[in-house]
Amino acid sequence: VLKSLNINTSTSSVEWKGVMVGIYSHNGFVSIKEGNLVWQGNSITGGSITIDMETMTQSDSLYKTEENKLVAHLESPDFFDVANFPTATFEITSSEQGTNTVYGNLTIRGITESEVVEDVIFDVETKSATGTLKFDRQKYGVAYKGSKKDMLVGDEVEMTISLNSEL
């Protein structure tokens, strides 16, 4: 039996992490605007989340005094171009029973690529799930255009996604 449940956006979260020159990292959060999870038994078989890119925050203490500057730069056309692409989405296409892996399509800056959420922990009673999605920002055009500065920023962005269903 398939059961589609809305995501509780106030208790769900997406934490991001990016690395610079392999030495230090920045991390923070973006809010989930809306979404749903489709459950079949103990597995998630479908669903989607819409991430509100306009809610980006920094939570690490490195350069915390410059948080507004960092977030503004990440929201700029150099990176996520939030003015033109205020949301990102992840649409679940399937999951592999017993592997804690969920597959889907991630859309950032209007570009959609297949991605994998790994190490997913499912809680069948509360209908919640937490997992890690790592993506190559270059595939989505998240880069300084033609700049050597781009080499200072690691290509991999990690998102820890924690979703709670509304029961």
Located regions from the model:
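Low-complexity, acidic/polar, glycine-enriched regions of mature
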Residues: 1-167
